[in-house]
Amino acid sequence: MKSNSNIRPSIIEPLGNGAYHYNYNIVERQETNYETGEVITVFDYDTVKVWDEPTYDKLVKAVIRATFDEMQELSIINEYNAGVLGVTTDKADKEDAKKAYKDYLTFVAETKAKVQADLEAAG
């Protein structure tokens, strides 16, 4: 979920009742308040909700699921494997599947690194 605030969000935000928000991809920017003309600092970021302790594994899974549902993930993997195993013979389809799978794996690796860095920063 995309979020915006004029206060820097904490990386891990307890919501009560065992729920937490993980705020990531936090970007600080300046904008002009349309009512006062004053330049203010705002923060744009992504948010996912997890339950119980916000562990590395839970946060990685939540970020991946916020981008890819299970069916999309399986489709990417199956299309790639169909090309590798020769089930799909169209060269363009194979290349598209290979690129989609590589992009997915890159996203997962970047997500894992980001979550690890955020957890270290959050203490």
Regions found by a protein language model. Name each.
Residues 2-123:
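A preference for well-ordered globular domain cores
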